[in-house]
């Protein structure tokens, strides 16, 4: 069954994400004494309070507010008193989930890749986080080695001019004749595990397809965009580990995202 094979890939990719998420480098922006508060969202009033766009300058939302769940917000030390006072005055219960964000970042040990080891014909591994350049090199490698199965579509460029490339995996070399599966990663810049999982799907579907039911390629075309937000992703690697959005600015808005 297709679902059985896809589940197998998802389980493998989940393991990749878990392994990598414990291995993140330090970055230039510092978050000393930033705290993450976990807020109880009991009703629509609480949900609207946390989601209020006027509060964007006060805190950074890590987990979106949903009624009967919790929301996580990162707060700068100079804003903490104002935020906790506002939460209390509006009847919102909260607790401190992370005491110091910078300490958490520094506990993550393995660096992102800087050297290009191409002994395998490409620079990719799935034990470290890679640049968009490395991922594109891997995509080119797959096209060169598996031309009857793999091709690339350039679907546009980012605000800063980076390519947005989709890997197409279509058995027989012709896409569009079968139902399609779409996978993308890196919509939120700081979530590095998702591009790693997207490229892991590439590897498993193309290089290790014999390990899965043939239906995955016989019955489906696959389209994989590893980095949906390349500008933000690279910025989170080089400057600000907590950056979430893209790099398009309006009205000189430059706060932590």
Identify the residue ranges that each predicted region occupies.
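Structural signal for hydrophobic/aromatic residues that build the beta-strand cores
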Residues: 1, 83, 161, 166, ...
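Soluble metallo-hydrolase cores and metallopeptidase-like ectodomains found primarily
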Residues: 127-183, 242-257
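Short, surface-exposed amphipathic charged segments that create phosphate/polyanion-binding patches used
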Residues: 109-115, 167, 239-241
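Cleavable N-terminal signal peptides of Sec/SRP-targeted secreted and luminal proteins
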Residues: 3-21
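Surface-exposed patches in mature extracellular/periplasmic domains of secreted proteins
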Residues: 97, 151-156, 211-215
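Structured segments of extracytoplasmic/periplasmic soluble domains
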Residues: 86, 90, 138-145, 201-208, ...
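Active-site/substrate-binding loop(s) of hydrolase catalytic cores
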Residues: 159, 174-257
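Intrinsic-disorder/low-complexity accessory segments
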Residues: 22-135, 220
